[in-house]
């Protein structure tokens, strides 16, 4: 990813411009700077050095983020390289991961994830609503 759309969209909204959505079906994970710090600290304190942790994050629809920001939206066509959904763990990687402390971890023993499991923003079981996004936007 090249980063968050938040600063770009906030700038456009402040200028009275519309934001462009290239894929109305697009979803993303909501990952705050504080969440990133918590993940790094947990990993350093609680995991052996050869492990990798992936956070369990809520997803949101990009159209609902625009709605939460009260943005005027222009729809464009999908561009080369655009992904509809973010994928944190592919189905072929998931055999190496387990669930631990509300995260996905590679490199420790434990209960395996179901065969073919994929951790994607489009198939996630945690979703932020427009109201949730409005609350989250107040703190970032």
Region annotations inferred by a language model:
Residues 2-140:
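Strand-loop microenvironment adjacent to phosphate/nucleotide-handling motifs in alpha/beta enzyme folds
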């Amino acid at each position: 990813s090249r980063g968050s759309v938040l600063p770009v969209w906030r700038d456009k909204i402040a200028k009275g411009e519309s934001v462009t959505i290239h894929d109305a079906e697009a979803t993303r994970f909501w990952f705050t700077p504080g969440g990133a710090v918590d993940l790094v600290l947990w990993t350093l304190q609680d995991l052996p050095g050869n492990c990798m942790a992936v956070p369990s994050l809520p997803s949101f629809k990009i159209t609902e983020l625009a709605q939460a920001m009260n943005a005027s939206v222009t729809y464009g066509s999908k561009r080369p390289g655009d992904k509809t959904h973010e994928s944190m763990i592919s189905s072929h990687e998931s055999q190496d991961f387990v669930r631990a402390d509300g995260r996905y971890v590679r490199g420790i023993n434990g209960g395996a994830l179901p065969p073919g499991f994929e951790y994607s923003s489009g198939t996630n079981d945690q979703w932020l609503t427009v109201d949730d996004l409005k609350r989250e936007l107040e703190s970032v």
